[in-house]
Amino acid sequence: MRHRVKKKKLNRPHSQRLALMRGLARELFEHGTIITTTAKAKAVKPFVESIITKAKKAALYAKEINERSNGDPEIQALRSKNVALRREINRHFNDRKLVKKICDEIAVNYIDRNGGYTRIIKVGRRRGDAAELSILQLVETKSEENVEN
């Protein structure tokens, strides 16, 4: 029985599945949008959203560190929490530049948003094997939408 089993296996062993998730997430964070199969997009969406949530927390800690004075005794605890969250994100990608981009550029856009950082748009079927393709993209923030209008 599959009670409470959430993750899709995508017909791959654990190590290959993890590498696939990390690769798709990396491309999504670097480019903002990717085209992949619907099954892969649905599988990577929770992974990406959890990373953005951690990055949001790190961004909030960084903001609070900048607002407080250097003499504040709680500032060291905030710094350690910020570093711990960044290291947790870095564990998946092993790329400090990407972690910096996620925490300082991407997560800041979603500070006021409670989840739903990505969207999946179905685009049709692939020609070779008729696999259903989807676009997985980061949701734009309201400030970006207002600039376009």
From Swiss-Prot:
Disulphide connectivity of cysteines: none
Domain of life: Bacteria
Transmembrane segments: none
Molecular function per GO: structural constituent of ribosome
Database matches in InterPro entries: Ribosomal_bL17, Ribosomal_bL17_CS, Ribosomal_bL17_sf
GO biological process, one term: translation
GO cellular component: cytosolic large ribosomal subunit
Keyword entries, A-Z: Ribonucleoprotein, Ribosomal protein
HAMAP family tied to this protein: Ribosomal_bL17
Similarity field: Belongs to the bacterial ribosomal protein bL17 family.
Assembly and interaction partners: Part of the 50S ribosomal subunit. Contacts protein L32.
Protein name: Large ribosomal subunit protein bL17
